[in-house]
Amino acid sequence: MPIDQQLLELLPQLMRFRTVDISAAAAALRLNPRTMQRKLKALGTSFEALRDATRKTLAQEYLVETSIPLARIAHSLGYSDLAVFHRSCTRWFDQTPAKFREQSRRSRPLVMSPSH
């Protein structure tokens, strides 16, 4: 499996528990960080791009599927500052995390549980 696909599978697992840098990701794949960088560059991507894509996916999941406070989501995705998370969400979704959460919830169909 190409290294970029391996990372896309690994990063969500690692990021749910801690902030992940290139050294931690490389160690999990038993690679030297520089070797991983070279392999990713050969595929036309970077660790930073894959981590950003993973953060976007996890942010979307947390914002839509949970009521976790924004500061906690930001921290769990490795942001030390809520303002940086806000900027990332605006870049990804063209709106703030609160607006994205609100709009996503309004547009989701209500699922009714069967009555007993």
Model-identified regions with their sequence ranges:
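Extended mid-to-C-terminal alpha-helical interaction segments
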Residues: 1-111, 116
